Amino acid sequence: MMMQKSLIGKSLKKAIVAGCLVAVTTTGALAAVEVDPKIAPYKKVSGVSGNLDSIGSDTLNNLMAYWAEGFRKEYPNVRIQIEGKGSTTAPPALVAGTAQLGPMSRPMKKDEEDAFVSKYGYKVTGIGVALDSLAVFVNKDNPIKSLSLPQVDAIFSKTHKGGIAEDYKTWGQLGLTGEWANLPLSLFGRNSASGTYGFFKEHALAKGDYKDTVKEQPGSASVVMGVTEDRSGIGYSGIGYKTSGVKAIALSAKEGAPAAEPNYENVLSGKYPLSRTLLIYVGKEPNKALSPVAAEFLKYILSKEGQEIVVKDGFLPLPAEVVEKELAKLN
């Protein structure tokens, strides 16, 4: 999570002290998250038209669609095409020039960055657009309250790099009793094209290998649907895909440590161990402006209206200080 720390760490802690408008229900669920009032409304400019192609993250797919819808209300002559098949599809699309926008739910890897530099001679630019708590979901009827990351590793990984040797196969091994004790764990996850797959592998599985029994799904919504329909299901996805059929459980970084709910306050403070920054990568040549349509679309995303869409879609908005830093990258 080094990218996240370098992008938002100190600013987020300051934002809490400054009193970001955060409300959490007594059950710890996400509730009443509001956009930082210091984020400015979007200011429409003249002369914006043309086409934008976005290829990348499935996690960001709905957000991109909502942002595009709002942006087209400002600029009806703009066409935005969005394809969300996974974060790994973004870097090659930017290199090939088939997309101007590369949404990713994880930071770009060095070899992906190097491929862009090799072709264009300058580095690709990542713009933070929203925050996310990568949630571990269970069925709404499941009584489990919390897990540690070592336990999550022992559930999903066959290599057990998190430190627990025991191979968890039933809910009873995780402390559930009665009718739940003998129910087998039913694992749902993303496929390898997904940035969420890679992020979870690195941070929850300590870079270990997934079990062969994980039912890989093509999208975040499919993971949540699987857990909804399978009473003994457990899966991972961005918090924005939460539905009434599942619950996101509290997580702790270590065995015996206090568990934190995946809410805004805990993401900002760093208490929730699977928080991340959602990004849009662009090929911005040094000392040259992006095309007006690409620049204005990103400015819209980083405006009051754009961050309100983040909240509407169930994700977490950026503090104003972070927005200012991201906007500066567009200059």
Language-model regions, residue ranges each:
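Sec/Tat signal peptide C-region and signal peptidase I cleavage site
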Residues: 14, 26-32
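N-terminal leader/targeting segments
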Residues: 3-5, 24, 33
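Bacterial N-terminal signal peptides that target proteins for export
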Residues: 3-17
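Flexible loop/hinge segments at secondary-structure junctions
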Residues: 31-331
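Classical Sec-dependent N-terminal signal peptides that target proteins to the secretory pathway
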Residues: 20, 24-26
